[in-house]
């Protein structure tokens, strides 16, 4: 297989027909395509026939929303999720020898808090062009809407599931934020949002700022920054809704 791939790659490069790897943004929720996905990006998506995707069903639905006339049955879908083995991902690289491939995650931009990095690294290794496309990223949008430091920040993914470990992690983030003037971003499984919120307001300093950015880009978007002290008087409606939490250990 590797020898065959090498021959195909050589022929395609000789005739300048190498594919490109496109990092394709997905919607963050129920939003009109035209509101968040540029027309140029839509045009590129419509011409791709192979997709490495986190969730095939979700991707099929997204592509139909992009363009109803797309023939889904003519497309190739490659699984690219937390269960994908690197050996399986390596078998996707030959598709790039003579055609473009797109990576699509379930929501937002692939490669950040979502699968995609391994295939991107392999594309670079084999000298294929990697092209990130413009679209919504909940992490970036939450950060710029928070009022926190955008020069020094960390995205920490999911916090520990057990409460003692979660509170310990929160205090570490708060200390780092205070000492290094660093903004800390993290997420939680939507049905545990309120548990995380309660831990934040009970364990952290009253002057630390907390931003909750929920359902970003949708009609139900909710973005609010307040001190922990002020959050104690509010119960945000964030249960089972996708949210980004932003901590910044600076008072207003």
Residue ranges and their predicted role:
Residues 28-30, 106-110, 190-192, 250-251:
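Short glycine-rich anion-binding loops that position phosphate/pyrophosphate groups of nucleotides
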Residues 22, 118-176:
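Class I SAM-dependent methyltransferase SAM-binding "motif I" and its flanking Rossmann-like core
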Residues 45-51, 128-131, 183-184:
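Short active-site oxyanion
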Residues 17-80:
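Glycine-rich, flexible N-terminal cofactor/catalytic loop recognition
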Residues 1-17:
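Short, Lys/Arg-enriched N-terminal segments with co-localized hydrophobic residues
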Residues 79-84, 159:
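Conserved helicase motor
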Residues 19-22, 100, 179-252:
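A contiguous loop/helix-start segment that scaffolds small-molecule binding in enzyme catalytic cores
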Residues 90-125:
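Glycine/small-residue-rich loop that forms an oxyanion/phosphate-binding "nest" at active or ligand-binding sites
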């Amino acid at each position: 297989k590797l020898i065959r791939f090498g021959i195909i790659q050589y022929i395609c490069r000789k005739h300048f027909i190498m594919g490109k790897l496109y990092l394709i943004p997905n919607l963050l929720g129920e939003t009109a395509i035209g509101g968040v996905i540029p027309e140029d990006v839509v045009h590129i998506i419509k011409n791709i026939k192979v997709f490495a995707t986190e969730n095939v069903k979700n991707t099929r639905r997204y592509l139909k929303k992009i363009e109803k006339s797309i023939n889904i049955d003519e497309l190739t879908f490659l699984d690219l999720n937390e269960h994908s083995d690197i050996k399986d991902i390596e078998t996707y690289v030959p598709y790039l020898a003579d055609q473009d491939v797109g990576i699509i995650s379930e929501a937002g931009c692939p490669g950040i808090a979502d699968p995609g990095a391994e295939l991107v690294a392999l594309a670079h290794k084999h000298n294929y062009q990697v092209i990130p496309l413009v679209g919504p990223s909940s992490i970036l949008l939450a950060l710029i809407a928070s009022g926190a430091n955008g020069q020094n920040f960390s995205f920490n993914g999911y916090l520990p599931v057990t409460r003692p470990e979660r509170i310990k992690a929160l205090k570490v983030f708060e200390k780092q934020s205070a000492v290094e003037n660093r903004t800390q971003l993290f997420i939680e499984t939507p049905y545990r949002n309120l548990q995380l919120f309660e831990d934040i307001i009970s364990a952290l300093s009253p002057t630390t700022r907390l931003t909750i950015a929920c359902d970003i880009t949708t009609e139900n978007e909710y973005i609010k920054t307040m001190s922990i002290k002020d959050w104690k008087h509010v119960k945000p409606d964030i249960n089972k809704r996708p949210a980004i939490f932003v901590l910044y250990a600076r008072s207003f």
